[in-house]
Structure formats: C-alpha cells, structure tokens
Amino acid sequence: MKHIIGLDAKRIVRNATGLGSYGRTLVNDLLRTAADDYLFRLYAPDEGREDLRQQVLQHPNLSFCYPQNVSGSKIQDSNVKGDSSLFTPFPSRARLPVAFHSSLFWRTFGIVRDLLRDGVQLYHGLSGELPVGIRKRGIKTVVTIHDLIFLRHPEYYKWIDRKIYAWKFRRTLKEADLIIAISDCTKRDIIHYGHVPEEKIRLVYQSCNTWFKQHVGDDQCQKVNARYELPNRYVIHVGTIEERKNILLAVQALPLLPEDLHLVVVGRQKPYAQQVLSEARRLGVDTRLHLLQGVPNADLPALYQMAEACVYPSRYEGFGIPIIEAIQSGLPVVACTGSCLEEAGGPSCLYVSPDDPEALASALLQVLKGAEGREARILQSQEYVRRFEGTDVASQVLAIYEELLSQR
C-alpha cells in the first residue's frame, strides 16, 4: 500500500533561505531515506522560482502540485515527474472562483479539497501552518513550528502582524495531531504559550545541507573574493539585517579588534541596516564593515571558508542554521545567549551576552587564526553538528509519519 504524504511547499518554491532551505533539505533527505512505498506531493500556490524548484531532487515518488486555475486545468511541474493520475482536474462544475486561488485563501481553505482528491493520508505543514478543517476530513496532520518570536519578542512586529500570527498559531494547534519543534527552546515556548501537552510535541532538530562541508577550490575563492571586493581578514555573519539579529553588537566590537579585521554581513537589508551603517560611521569603522545583499547560495561556501570566524549575535532564534553552516565550513563560532543558539553550536562554540560588545570582542580574539586551541575547538564543533545531518533527521520525521499513519 502506498503512503501518500502531502507537504506545504510555498516556502520551498519562494524562499531562498530560512524556511525554504529547511523544506528543500528535508524533502531531499526524505527522498533519500524513505522506502519506495512513500509518495510525496509538494503543494504550492504557484510555481514560484524555477531555480529553487530545481534544488529539489527529481524522483519518481515526488511531484509538485498547484491549485486549479479558473479553467479547471491543473498546472504540473514539468521538471519533476510523478504519478500523473494524481493530477486529474476537477470536472467543470467544480471550478472555483478566482478569489479562491489567492495564495492565502488556497493554503488556508482550498487546499483541503485538493488533498482529499489526491488521496493524501498525511499532511505536513513545514512552516508553522495547517489548513482550516483538515483534521475533520480525516487527514492526519503534523506541523513544524520553527519559533514563536512574535510572542517572545513582540516588539519586533507590527500590531496587525502579531494578531495574524497569533490567530494562525492557535488555529494550527487545534488542527495538528503532532507538532515538530526544531529546538528544545521552541518546544518550551510551544508548551508555555500554546498550553500544549508535552506528549504532543516531538523534538526534531533542523537538518543542514552538507554542501558546506565540501572544500572550495582556490579558483572559486578568488572569483568570489574579486566579485565582492573582500578584505584579506574578516569575520562573517549570514542572515537578514534586522533588529533581532543584533548586528550593532558586532559593529560595536570592531574597535576592540585588530585594525585589519573586517566584518562581512551577508543578507537581505531591512531599515535596521541604516542604523548599523550609522553606528559604524560614528565609531570610525565604516571602512571595515561590508554589507552584501543578493548573494546567491552558490557563493556562500566560499564566503564562509575565506573567513576567520563566524559571529552570530542574534537576540533570539528558533534554531540558527548559519551557525551549523559556518561550523561545517571549518569556522569557529561566537554567538549570543538567550535562545537556542547553544543547541545549534554546541559546547565548543563561545557565547556572550547580546548586550556586551567587550565580551564579544574578547571571545572573537580567542578564536581568530593563531589563537591557542582554535583548531581543537573547530574539530569538536564539527563532531557535534553531525547530529544535524540529513538522514538522521529524515529518519526521525519518517518515524512520526509512521506513528500517525498507523492510527488511521
């Protein structure tokens, strides 16, 4: 008997990093690990970005599924083959109004109809959401919740966004048979804010793409170096440049570090970036600060491997994938206390208060090239993060699927 698993793929086809990376990595790991009696259907409101879809393995047991258009036809991804019988369009009398096909409305309400038609037995919400009414229709459900930052740190969100996220969170808890938390920190938050019994939550750490472990050749490093006009020595931070990421702390530590050491920040820039630039100018270190935006994923391994260390001063994260990427790239990491970053980096990374630039500078001096114990620290961290490699994570997720499917 075939097990048909549906997964929310909106972020998979739209988001290059973060939730998109989580979804693509997990799906690829599931395809490598699952038995042939598993069929995976990725449900997205549209085709999204072709370059992101192509990062998902082509596999006979995988298909992308999209909502019907107003003519009643089904759009199927031509790049990924699957069982075409699952894409039979609705008859004309079942055609849906145009408004039904908006991304939000379809993912919240309309998708359940598609799941039932396609014979989906279990649906996995990969980004903290489940459709309304799915549990009542007999489809088993599991949802991955990455973080509850909007509840822990409401100051980072607009009032209306907090209301919307809170509504989605409460609704999803009612629809979920089981919940996956990607860190123990997130698990505790779900129990605290959602009043969810612990037995309903499974802790499954997020997996990381192992391509960061691969050595980047000198030619590629030289090309990336020239493309971004990189300094000879730098520490790196990867992540959206927003208030929660606390980049100001790293900038304030720069005057306390060697003058030839620079800070390279890779990520999408939000208005907070202007505060970062202003602070760098005030401290006289603006020439040592490099903000890189629009960097393709293919350049990240070289950017990591040419750095001396990774600095991750975020005030709060659900997990902290860039820490694992940096460790796999052979870098020591300095991060901040207060959330789950110790879970991601392990005991051989260094952690400081998110409000103490002197402590951050002191920690960085302990891990720069030439520092005593640096290489041992890197090796110990690399051993620690092996637990986040894909097949182990996929096996845990498959065990959850099997637990729920056995209850049908």
Language-model features, listed with the residues they occupy:
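Carbohydrate transferase catalytic cores enriched for Leloir-type hexosyltransferases
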Residues: 1-408
